[in-house]
Swiss-Prot record:
Cofactor(s) of this protein: Mg(2+)
A molecular-function term among this protein's GO annotations: nucleic acid binding
Protein residues bound to Mg(2+) 1: D23
Listed name of the protein: Ribonuclease T
Residues marked Important for substrate binding and specificity (site): F29, F77, F125, F147
NCBIfam families cross-referenced by the UniProt entry: RNaseT (TIGR01298)
Documented EC number(s): 3.1.13.-
GO BP of this protein: DNA replication proofreading; tRNA processing
Organism: Vibrio campbellii (strain ATCC BAA-1116)
Binding site for Mg(2+) 2: D23, E25, H182, D187
A cellular component annotation (GO) from this entry: cytosol
Cofactor note: Binds two Mg(2+) per subunit. The active form of the enzyme binds two Mg(2+) ions in its active site. The first Mg(2+) forms only one salt bridge with the protein.
Keywords, alphabetical: Exonuclease, Hydrolase, Magnesium, Metal-binding, Nuclease, tRNA processing
Length: 214
């Protein structure tokens, strides 16, 4: 691999971090007490031109953990009317996270990256719920950095002057279906496209690769 081609890799682009786009749907705002009900993760890949693209998608509906709080307003907001319905096909937090982390570790290794980093819209919220679930499940091998993230609310505010996901996507020239919004699957896919678009636009403007200083 030439020096020029080496610069056009995920490992080089994000300082060894492997970006993974995540969205969660929950039964409230408190990560310690409120249920995690849905999670989706989208991995990313970089092509030979150094452009970023969505790669693999993994998605789960999740059973409320024992004793979890369920805020009525939150359930109305995300459209999950009955978190205990067998029609949801929900699995435990532990099963969902283990499968997601298995995929992340596999693709992180293939990209020769040292650690995963979460990409999310208002990322502190999503990371707080994932970290709380990790603690409940006593998971030791967690691929994500415990606090560092790429927040697309901040990035889209810089790039497009919009911080709301729907408005940021539209400002970026993307379609956004409000009827599909607040589904972890749909929101993660849209966030992944938004993040890739911002990164690729910055590259097209000459912001990457950096010119090495001698």
């Amino acid at each position: 691999m030439t020096i020029e081609n080496e610069a056009l890799t995920l490992k080089k682009r994000f300082r060894g971090y492997f970006p993974v786009v995540v969205d969660v749907e929950t039964a409230g705002f408190n990560a310690q007490t409120d249920a995690l009900l849905e999670i989706c993760a989208v991995t990313l890949s970089m092509d030979e031109n150094g452009d970023l693209h969505p790669a693999s998608t993994i998605h789960f509906h999740i059973e409320p953990f024992e004793g979890a709080n369920l805020e009525k307003e939150a359930l109305e907001f995300n459209g999950i009317r009955d978190p205990f319905s067998p029609l949801r096909g929900a699995v435990s937090e532990q099963e969902a996270l283990k499968e997601i982390y298995k995929l992340i570790r596999k693709e992180q290794k293939a990209a020769d990256c040292s650690r995963a980093i979460m990409v999310a819209h208002n990322a502190a919220f999503d990371l707080s719920f994932v970290n709380a679930a990790n603690e409940r499940c006593k998971l030791k091998r967690v691929p994500f950095h415990p606090f560092a993230t790429f927040d697309t609310a901040t990035l889209s505010g810089l790039a497009y002057g919009q911080t709301v996901l729907a408005k940021a996507c539209k400002a970026a020239g993307m379609e956004f279906d409000n009827r599909e919004a607040h589904s972890a699957l749909y929101d993660t896919q849209q966030t992944a496209e938004l993040f890739c678009g911002i990164v690729n636009k910055w590259k097209a403007l000459g912001g990457w690769p950096l010119v090495d200083e001698e």
